[in-house]
């Protein structure tokens, strides 16, 4: 893969001396960017044999949450730093994704992705506090969209019987 997730990562001091610390991209794509940068500077990565951490696959998780902002923004940062960054292809892909969110009435998710793109375009100053400020901004932004509010099952009002099952 060319990188290792943080859970399987041991970083020798010489790597930090040569390439610096990971970028403060809380919390997605930071390990990928660091691994790509390490490999580009001659440091191979390897997963420790039999090491592993189980967590739900990212595709199983709820895509409509605040973390989507960091995924969009940080993937764009990584692409800009370590790829040919085909602006046309990225624009088409992101345009389709945001259109899909809007057509699906996932307005909060569309707004979240757009904020990630806008902040990427604003430049590196967005990384200054490691994400602390923007996390609060994203949560507030998303709270303006009713479909992003999670409700516990206990909040569902009692439903009157239609009488069908009572017969």
Question: What residues fall within each predicted segment?
Answer:
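Hydrophobic alpha-helix feature that most strongly marks membrane-spanning transmembrane helices
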Residues: 21, 37-43, 58, 80, ...
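Donor nucleotide-sugar recognition loop
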Residues: 4-8, 18-36, 42-48
């Amino acid at each position: 893969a060319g990188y290792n997730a943080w859970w399987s990562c041991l970083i020798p001091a010489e790597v930090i001396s040569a390439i610096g610390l990971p970028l403060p991209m809380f919390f997605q794509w930071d390990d990928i960017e660091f691994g790509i940068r390490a490999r580009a500077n001659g440091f191979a990565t390897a997963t420790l044999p039999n090491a592993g951490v189980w967590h739900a696959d990212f595709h199983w998780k709820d895509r409509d949450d605040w973390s989507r902002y960091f995924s969009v923004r940080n993937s764009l940062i990584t692409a800009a730093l370590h790829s040919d960054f085909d602006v046309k292809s990225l624009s088409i892909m992101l345009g389709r994704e945001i259109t899909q969110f809007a057509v699906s009435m996932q307005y909060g998710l569309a707004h979240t992705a757009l904020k990630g793109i806008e902040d990427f375009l604003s430049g590196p100053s967005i990384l200054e506090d490691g994400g602390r400020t923007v996390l609060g901004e994203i949560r507030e932004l998303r709270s303006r969209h009713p479909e992003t509010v999670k409700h516990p099952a206990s909040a569902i009002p009692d439903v009157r019987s239609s009488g069908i099952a009572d017969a």
